[in-house]
Structure formats: C-alpha cells, structure tokens
Amino acid sequence: MTTQKIVPTKSTDGSKLFRHQAKFVAGAMNINQILNFSLPEIAFVGKSNVGKSSLINTICNNKNLAKVSNTPGRTRQINFFNLADKLIIVDLPGYGFANVPISVKEQWGVLISYYLRNSYNLRLVNLLIDSRRGIKENDKKVADLLLANKREFQIIFTKSDKVTDHKNLHDEAQNFLATLNYSCNVMYVSNRSKEGARELKASLAKCIKPQK
C-alpha cells in the first residue's frame, strides 16, 4: 500500500476551507461498510472521552455535527463527514474504554486498525491525548501502528484549558517522539477556549488536493 504526501494549499490558515458546512455522509460499524470517497481523508483517533467528536464540532463550527456524550464509548462506529467536497473528516471509535464487553472492544480494535492500515485516501491522523492524563500505553500502540504503516500523524493534546503548564506536556511529547525517531506537529487545543483551533485547521487544510 502506498500513501501520498501532504500537499500544501494556497490557503495557509484553513479559515476559507472551514467556512464551508461539513455534513455527515456515512457510518461504518464493520470493515465491509467502509466506503471509498475518492477524497483526501483526515482521521481523529484517541482514547474514549478524549474529545474527538467535540473537537470535530469545534473546527467545523457546528456543535451538532458529531454526536457528543460525557459517557465514554458512545462513538461505536467510524463516522465520515464531507467538508465542501474537498476533505473527508473521519471520527474513529475511542479505544481503551473498559466498561464494554470484550467482544465489543475487540470489534472496535479490528475496525480502527483496519481503517488505519488500509485507507488509501488517508492523508493525516490526529492522535488525540487528554492533557490531564498524558501519553498512555494504548496511545503508544496506535503510534507504532501508524509508523509501521507509514502514516503521517500529529499529536493533539485536548482539554488544554484543564492544565496550567504546557511545558511538561511538550517535554513528554518530545521524549515520546524521540523514542519513535519521528518528528511531527504537537498542538494544544481546547473546545472551551478555542485554543489551537486555527493552527489545527491550517494543518488539515494542507491535506486537500491542489486546485487545478
């Protein structure tokens, strides 16, 4: 399997792209339901209740786009959202949630792993980490999977308004990346204060196809 490199766009800040309204286009509860949209895809992955759906709603300026719940494990399928026929935003089920049957956790694991390994159109993965919890073993396993499949990814610390010192997070991320021999963006975002939203949009806008 081959992947294509991120191609810079004319819009450097992403604001023009994200003025458009994103819409839900499909959900996949098993690998046979995963569709090929022939558009660049950017995925959000992380532990249950890390804030994936809320972050998607924040950058798309629509609090009702992706279903949000305070109960971990509510996203039980891969959800696909079309942004202006230029980009597919992918909300993956959370991992590491204990209060579901083992069979369900295994099903989610297979679904997440299959998508990350096999999506031809996947351009960038956003690995979301709860700022209050730091990088955990499951996060490291996902990063290993991404590297093994030559996937571009960046680290997004969510709920950054809940911590007062980002330096420890930065040091933790850099030490983690050093063990992987990998370099990438490290961002801090807050759905409440909107910190980091503009920078995140800019990084995602670089993934769309160049205008002809």
From Swiss-Prot:
Keywords: Cell cycle, Cell division, GTP-binding, Magnesium, Metal-binding, Nucleotide-binding, Septation. It holds the Pfam family MMR_HSR1. GO terms for biological process: division septum assembly. It comes from the Bacteria. The keyword Cell division applies. GTP binds at residues 46-53, 73-77, 91-94, 158-161, 189-191. Residues 38-210 form the EngB-type G domain. GO terms for molecular function: GTP binding; metal ion binding. InterPro entries: G_ENGB_dom, GTP-bd, GTP-bd_ribosome_bio_YsxC, P-loop_NTPase. Its cofactor is Mg(2+). Mg(2+) binds at S53, T75. Belongs to the TRAFAC class TrmE-Era-EngA-EngB-Septin-like GTPase superfamily. EngB GTPase family. HAMAP family: GTPase_EngB. Necessary for normal cell division and for the maintenance of normal septation. This is Probable GTP-binding protein EngB. It comes from Rickettsia conorii (strain ATCC VR-613 / Malish 7). The lineage of its organism: Bacteria, Pseudomonadati, Pseudomonadota, Alphaproteobacteria, Rickettsiales.
